């Protein structure tokens, strides 16, 4: 991943945009090398947090990891991940909340970032 490119947003059929490059640019003050670094960290951290959400037996721990994922995603421009994590956080009272939409949002966003170079 050596540059930031592609359209400002890539939206799925409905819901939040998959990725908002303008948000990333704002957060990094337009610094391309910082954008590359932030995206690399985001990609690793999003997977780590999702794994922790999936593995958490304790609802409180799951909620904490979801809040971390929401903040990370919003700051980086991964709007769909933030939206799906927020929806899951709202449904966390359920004993077995459906993690599939969030896992799919992460997979789609990471695939997009890998495909476009950011």
Q: What is the role of each PLM region?
A:
Residues 1-22, 33-44, 48-50, 72-87, ...:
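Amphipathic, coiled-coil-like alpha-helical segments
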Residues 24-25, 29:
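Short amphipathic alpha-helical boundary/capping segments
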Residues 57-64:
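All-alpha amphipathic helical-bundle segments outside canonical DNA-binding/catalytic cores
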Residues 69:
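An anion-binding catalytic pocket shared by soluble metabolic enzymes
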